[in-house]
């Protein structure tokens, strides 16, 4: 008798995706982050659902409703901090996942890669709108500054901003629609994840060597399910430590002050995971130029497959490209630090140099170094 998981219409889809899926035998722990992201998304949707049961999206009561969740709702504090710090964990896994894709040349699967970029934009939009909901000082001013960037779009900019605000400033209408979108977007992200997996399973996984692994495949279960469970446990330990010992470590103290349109905080900044893009935005004196640079800082990932001229897929055997990759990581960390600093000397010039370097690495240095490595292969 054939096993039900191989015959049942629904179970056989799950079976072919997570049980009997042929996977390369050489996958390292860098391939854990896909499943960790799925776990993060599940945690965010569950905690978010319970938070939404107690939250009110009205400017008069939003801040108090968050305080009420933390003080009066059973285990409301842990729900709130799991949700807030779960977002940080989500972005850590997301950036490591993208970094792994860049390092090992996974971007050559262009459909999977492009859906991944869409996912990145969708998750960033969700996180931004979620940051506005507690209606603290940084929520309000962050929403004002970031949405106002759209006014840089020629001709339709001002109308577009007022349309998003639902009025002439960030107010009740803005908060209500941001809550609606923040609730809806994770489900759109879940649908995009399915598409991402669909395209991935069309081609099969890449592996650290970048060499086709068809002759050497092993079943996903039990080998990689066990490996993923270990990843879950490590991430859960880190998240629990963050939530239980220093829940406000990654937040902004200004967000514990209720939103006040008459009082601007001394330094407006987004959450830490957007600081690199915020630093790139600030490093360009022109408003439209800054907005374009901000969008391009993420959209540049879509150009990476077109600039891949190396004869080898992975960076595993390309030491020059490896140096460049770690330079890129250093530049990103520098930009993240600069994004959190005030706009003054020497931070401005450091931010500008790092921003130029960021784009140069992608557009000039990577292809150049690949060409040099191709030449060295002839020796």
From Swiss-Prot:
Binding site for heme b b566: 97, 196
Cofactor (UniProt): heme b
A GO term from the CC aspect: respiratory chain complex III
InterPro entries on file: Cyt_b/b6_C, Cyt_b/b6_C_sf, Cyt_b/b6_N, Cytb/b6-like_sf, Cytochrome_b, Cytochrome_b_C_euk/bac, Cytochrome_b_N_euk/bac, Di-haem_cyt_TM
Membrane-topology annotation of the record: Multi-pass membrane protein
Biological process according to GO: mitochondrial electron transport, ubiquinol to cytochrome c
Localisation: Mitochondrion inner membrane
Positions that bind a ubiquinone: 201
Keywords: Electron transport, Heme, Iron, Membrane, Metal-binding, Mitochondrion, Mitochondrion inner membrane, Respiratory chain, Transmembrane, Transmembrane helix, Transport, Ubiquinone
Membrane-spanning segments: 33-53, 77-98, 113-133, 178-198, 226-246, 288-308, 320-340, 347-367
Signal peptide as annotated in the record: none
Described purpose of this protein according to its UniProt entry: Component of the ubiquinol-cytochrome c reductase complex (complex III or cytochrome b-c1 complex) that is part of the mitochondrial respiratory chain. The b-c1 complex mediates electron transfer from ubiquinol to cytochrome c. Contributes to the generation of a proton gradient across the mitochondrial membrane that is then used for ATP synthesis.
Subunit structure, interactors included: The cytochrome bc1 complex contains 11 subunits: 3 respiratory subunits (MT-CYB, CYC1 and UQCRFS1), 2 core proteins (UQCRC1 and UQCRC2) and 6 low-molecular weight proteins (UQCRH/QCR6, UQCRB/QCR7, UQCRQ/QCR8, UQCR10/QCR9, UQCR11/QCR10 and a cleavage product of UQCRFS1). This cytochrome bc1 complex then forms a dimer.
Protein name as it appears in the record: Cytochrome b
Upper taxonomic lineage: Eukaryota, Metazoa, Chordata, Craniata, Vertebrata
């Amino acid at each position: 008798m054939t096993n039900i998981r191989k015959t049942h219409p629904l179970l056989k889809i799950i079976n072919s995706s997570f049980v009997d899926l042929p996977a390369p035998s050489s996958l390292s722990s860098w391939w854990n982050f896909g499943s960790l992201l799925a776990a993060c998304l599940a945690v965010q949707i569950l905690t978010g659902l319970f938070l939404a049961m107690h939250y009110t999206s009205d400017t008069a009561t939003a801040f108090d409703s968050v305080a009420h969740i933390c003080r009066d709702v059973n285990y409301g504090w842990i729900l709130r901090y799991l949700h807030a710090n779960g977002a940080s964990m989500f972005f850590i896994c997301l950036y490591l996942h993208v970094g792994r894709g860049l390092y090992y040349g996974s971007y050559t699967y262009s459909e999977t890669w492009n859906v991944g970029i869409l996912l990145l934009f969708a998750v960033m939009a969700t996180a931004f709108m979620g940051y506005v909901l507690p209606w603290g000082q940084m929520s309000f001013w962050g929403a004002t500054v970031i949405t106002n960037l759209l006014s840089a779009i020629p001709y339709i900019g001002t109308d577009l901003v007022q349309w998003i605000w639902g009025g002439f400033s960030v107010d009740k209408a803005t908060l209500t629609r941001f809550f609606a979108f923040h609730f809806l977007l994770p489900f759109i992200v879940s649908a995009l994840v399915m598409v991402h997996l669909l395209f991935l399973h069309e081609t099969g996984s890449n592996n650290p060597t970048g060499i086709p692994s068809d002759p050497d495949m092993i079943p996903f279960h039990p080998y990689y399910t066990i490996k993923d469970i270990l990843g879950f446990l490590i991430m859960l330990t880190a998240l629990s430590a963050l939530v239980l010992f220093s829940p406000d470590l990654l937040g902004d103290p200004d967000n514990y002050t209720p939103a006040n349109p008459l009082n601007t905080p001394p330094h407006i900044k987004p959450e830490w995971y957007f600081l690199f893009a915020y630093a790139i935005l600030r490093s360009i004196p022109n408003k439209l130029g800054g907005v374009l640079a901000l969008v391009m800082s993420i959209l540049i990932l879509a150009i990476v497959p077109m600039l891949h001229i190396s004869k080898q897929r992975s960076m595993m055997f390309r030491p020059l490209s490896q140096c460049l990759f770690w330079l890129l990581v250093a530049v990103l960390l520098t930009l993240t630090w600069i994004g959190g600093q005030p706009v003054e000397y020497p931070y401005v010039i450091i931010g500008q140099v790092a921003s130029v370097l960021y784009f140069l690495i992608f557009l000039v240095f990577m292809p150049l170094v690949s060409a040099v490595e191709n030449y060295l292969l002839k020796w």
